[in-house]
């Protein structure tokens, strides 16, 4: 069964009409949605799904509690490593890895700056899962399905963002069971 991981930048707090239409198609097809608990895109998606009275939603949270669950949906608290007491990028990316593992496709809302959103695209691509990225400043959807698509998508990123993504990818790979696609960076 298709499960959609919807996520995005914390700086995106409102959904454009184009994004709402994509989510409406997900709702029409009755596809389960996996969404995080962060402010920004996660919360905006939650609020839109709640406004549509959509029930096939699961909210993923790192650690013991969720920051946002506007629809009162089932929550999945994802255990963090014992050294994960600091609520930093690594702490919150725990739930993102779980959603990328479980989802079959992704819809990411990107502001051209968020490292976390780009990392979610990479996580999904490493699992050979299609991702549709909405590039908010350009009001454009980009399909990322292959390594070539990933390279083209990455070429849109500023050099400092590429460096941060490369660093986070190495940290994540060293902490996870070995991925065979380090060449994606």
What is each PLM-predicted segment?
Residues 11-177:
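Acidic/glycine-enriched connector segments
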């Amino acid at each position: 069964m298709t499960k959609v991981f919807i996520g995005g930048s914390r700086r995106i707090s409102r959904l454009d009409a184009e994004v709402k239409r994509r989510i409406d198609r997900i709702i029409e097809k009755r596809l389960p949605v996996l969404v995080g608990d962060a402010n920004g895109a996660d919360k905006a998606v939650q609020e839109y799904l709640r406004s549509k009275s959509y029930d096939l939603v699961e909210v993923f949270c790192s650690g013991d509690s969720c920051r946002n669950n506007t629809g009162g949906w089932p929550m999945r608290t994802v255990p963090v490593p014992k050294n994960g007491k600091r609520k930093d990028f690594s702490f919150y990316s725990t739930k993102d890895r779980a959603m990328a593992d479980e989802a079959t496709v992704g819809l990411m809302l990107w502001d051209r700056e968020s490292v976390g959103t780009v990392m979610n695209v990479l996580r999904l691509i490493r699992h050979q899962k299609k991702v549709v990225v909405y590039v908010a400043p350009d009001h454009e959807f980009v399909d990322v399905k292959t390594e070539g698509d990933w390279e083209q998508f990455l070429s849109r990123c500023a050099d400092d963002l590429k460096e941060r993504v490369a660093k986070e990818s190495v940290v994540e790979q060293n902490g996870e069971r070995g991925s065979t696609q380090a060449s994606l960076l």
